[in-house]
């Protein structure tokens, strides 16, 4: 009958080629799953379906895997290349019939007894048509909803309407030799394999499609019926002298304001639309480390995505990537400012839930929101929220807002019934469409309220935006985190279950800083960010093209030989190709003279490009500081260089969210020094580290590194000088005076970086001084100059230019 099956597959292949578009997950099966396409493969599918086999055939052709239609030859015997757990349902009954897989598997293991060298790869393959999670109340749309083993008539409609949304998901191969060597008879081993396969297919479906959607009334009952919400209703009714019914209606309105209303059909439409937009706007979207997240999902974790926030495009890009990586589309926390017609309704149906900027004083709203969030966690929906609370206007990570993280930890404490992992996500662009409006806001212009016309205007202006980058960071298992930070947290909570734990706030603060460090740990370096860093460090923001290309090559060599982390991504292109690609973005100016090509910043773009430089500033903070130290001292012994780096590192770590501990940073600095010597960015003379010879080609790259850290050091010097002058000063007044003087320095010395006098950056630095005990604090909370801050100021002043030092004396 094999020939008849093959004939049928051939006959239907013509219409199916037009109807079916296959998405293979993952695409790099050799690296992620360890599948070797040179070894015999048997594919294990859930349902014996001709259309599923056709989709599998299309996928294997694109991945270079053996064809599922060709039998596997073993010792002169033929084995089918596909095994199936179930037959399709019949038209008249809902009963699912089992295939003869038990006999096939038993025969396979019997062959192992006859051929000891035999080792087949059994690869489970899950095939999905559409990704509708389903509802408890059925409707007409359920006719085409993908289900386990549908009958042939339903499968016809499924392929007809959902053929373009086919997903072929491969899992790690099972070694038939390993299975055959297990204890037990061939029949027992075969039954074990079948049982495990059934469980695996169920979990794989949950990982891709997610849990069943809640009906609205079920949502109301779950949230409004929670003890905390009922208590909040009673308290508010008592305080406002209204009936419980009135406050209950108010709480119900809060649920409607907050809750998502997910519609898989709209997500599919959005996928098609976004694919066209990405193809028009971006040269490519580079995604790294998605395998880490798939592994978490496969192990049953509740996944919470915490990305950095650069642009409104983040909402779309991350969800799009998650969808195409074969993961459940998350419910997304969005600011209430985005809940305007018609965008709010569209976002809500794509999984967005809305939150107010502040919950302060509104205990009822807080209770409703917290219960809704915990409901999402407990039902198994993945969630995405932005720890910064808003978009970064400078390109740096903002200090984290801890409210959502605190609610997440509180949900875990109350008892989420599966492991919870936070996944940091780094998102980077070579062009952010809002940068011009960010600069206006930094100059004091009021932020424009989001509207449909604003969105329409932005879409109309879409053009070449270069590349987009999305790197998944190192996940944080929250139970393990709490076990490390608060070993007795379970016992403490059991003793006082209704009270907020005293350890919660410090634990949340530690978690928040860890999250931000892990986001930056997964940073993506781009041609745009490298060009911006070099040109902004150059005098008059101009460089010869060959100098720019050489500097970029030097920095790429540095990052490859001494990588900032294993999770950060570095371009594979060389400096010349990166400069050529960056010029196509039309942000740089090119001019010619008799000596060659000069590349400079357009006057209108000079400030805007600080945004892209700031995306990667943390990767070059330590190389820049090393260069500044060696340059200022005109040579220094290695231990002294490391000592000076160690003195300033806690401040850089706090400001730039560098993930390394102090010890790790010192070890990394030592490695950097060796690498910089190897590639010519430093010169070793006996025990002294010196700048490269001024005549060497590497000197300019070294000098630019020194310049890249200067604005940070100048800002440090300004704050410390004001503190020295005042001796004792309030934190608010110190921040205000520091900002005013930084603005003056920027005006007098042509510093075009908005973050040079940004209040968040200055506030973070002053907090870091206090937390690291580099300044004193009086009992009244006043900040005080100290011997330690005096020594720190002296070290910093040695590293900055004399003209800036002279200007500081005028304070």
Curated annotation (Swiss-Prot):
The keyword NADP is assigned to this record: no
EC number in record: 2.3.1.15
Catalysed reaction, written as an equation: sn-glycerol 3-phosphate + an acyl-CoA = a 1-acyl-sn-glycero-3-phosphate + CoA
Compartments, record wording: Cell inner membrane
InterPro entries attached to this UniProt entry: GPAT/DHAPAT, GPAT/DHAPAT_C, GPAT/DHAPAT_LPLAT, GPAT_PlsB, Plipid/glycerol_acylTrfase
This protein's pathway: Phospholipid metabolism; CDP-diacylglycerol biosynthesis; CDP-diacylglycerol from sn-glycerol 3-phosphate: step 1/3
Annotated Pfam families: Acyltransferase, GPAT_C
Annotated GO biological process: CDP-diacylglycerol biosynthetic process; fatty acid metabolic process
Assigned protein family: Belongs to the GPAT/DAPAT family.
PANTHER family on file: DIHYDROXYACETONE PHOSPHATE ACYLTRANSFERASE (PTHR12563:SF17), GLYCEROL-3-PHOSPHATE ACYLTRANSFERASE (PTHR12563)
Full protein name: Glycerol-3-phosphate acyltransferase
